[in-house]
A protein has these predicted regions:
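Divalent cation-coordinating acidic motifs and surrounding scaffolds
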Residues: 1-79, 84, 88-117
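Structured segments of extracytoplasmic/periplasmic soluble domains
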Residues: 2-3, 63-70, 119-123, 146-149, ...
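Extracytoplasmic/secreted proteins, especially bacterial periplasmic and envelope-associated proteins
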Residues: 55-66, 115-118, 138-141, 145-148, ...
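Catalytic cores of nucleophile-dependent amide-cleaving enzymes
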Residues: 75, 79-88, 94-165
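Short, surface-exposed amphipathic charged segments that create phosphate/polyanion-binding patches used
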Residues: 167-175
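A conserved active-site cap/scaffold subdomain adjacent to cofactor or substrate pockets
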Residues: 177-191
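Single conserved hydrophobic/aromatic residue that forms the stacking wall/gate
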Residues: 193-204
C-alpha cells in the first residue's frame, strides 16, 4: 500500500549503537521519511543532536515536543524499536542479580515505563497507539501504567525476532483513516508469523 506523504508525517529518531570513535558512528538524528515520485524512500534531516543518552526522559521529551510542534497532526502514534524487559523499574537494588523490566536501552541506560508516562504528560499528548517493537513490551502492568496516555498498546509479552517488524507492512497501517490501533496490531502480527521456527516465538 502507498501512503500520501502530503497528508501524513513519518518521523524517525535514530541513535545507533556504534561508539563515537568508530568509523560508522553518526550523531543521534531526527529524520522525516517520505517517498519521491519514483517511489524511492528519502530522508530529510530535521535535527542532528550532539551525543546524548536517548533513554533520558528529558531527551525523549525534547524530541517529542519538537515533532509535535513542527509537525502538528490530528492524531499521533509511537513506535519504540529497541530492547526491552517489561515493567519493573531499572535499577532494582533490592535483590542482587534480579531481572528488571524496562523498555528502551542506550548502552547501560534504560527507559522505565513510568518515565515514559511522565514524558507523555509533560508533552501533553494522547497517542492513538504505541507499538513496542521490543521484547516484553506488553503486559497488564505496562497497559495499566499507560492507560491514560494511549488508546491501543501493541507488543509481545515474550521475546520477538531480532530484526523486529516488517515496516513495509506496518507503516501503511499506521496511517489508516480509522481503527488505526487495530490495523497496526494486525499488520505487526502478520509481519511476524511468516518467520520460520525457531526464531518465531512471539505471542502478540
Amino acid at each position: 500500500s502507498t501512503v500520501d506523504a502530503s497528508l501524513y508525517n513519518l518521523l524517525v529518531y535514530v541513535d545507533d549503537a556504534s561508539s563515537e570513535n568508530s568509523q560508522s558512528y553518526s550523531f543521534p538524528t531526527l529524520y522525516r521519511l517520505s517517498k519521491d515520485k519514483r517511489g524511492n524512500v528519502t530522508k530529510e534531516i530535521i535535527r542532528e543532536y550532539k551525543e546524548q543518552v536517548s533513554t533520558d526522559p528529558s531527551v525523549m521529551q525534547e524530541v517529542m515536543k519538537r515533532a509535535f510542534t513542527e509537525y502538528p497532526a490530528e492524531s499521533y502514534g509511537l513506535v519504540v524499536w529497541s530492547h526491552g524487559e517489561g515493567w519493573i523499574p531499572s535499577p532494582l537494588p533490592i535483590v542482587k542479580n534480579a531481572s528488571t523490566r524496562w523498555i528502551g536501552q542506550d548502552g547501560g541506560h534504560y527507559l522505565n515505563i513510568t518515565d515514559m508516562v511522565s514524558v507523555f504528560e509533560a508533552v501533553g499528548c494522547h497517542l492513538d497507539f504505541i507499538l513496542f517493537d521490543a521484547c516484553f513490551g506488553q503486559s497488564i502492568e505496562v497497559a495499566y501504567e499507560l492507560r491514560n496516555n494511549v488508546s491501543y498498546i501493541i507488543g509481545s509479552p515474550t521475546e520477538i525476532p531480532g530484526p523486529g517488524a516488517s515496516y513495509d507492512k506496518v507503516v501503511p497501517a499506521m496511517f489508516a483513516s480509522e481503527n488505526v490501533g487495530v490495523k497496526v496490531g494486525k499488520a505487526y502480527y502478520l509481519s511476524l508469523i511468516h518467520i520460520s521456527e525457531p526464531t518465531r516465538r512471539t505471542p502478540i
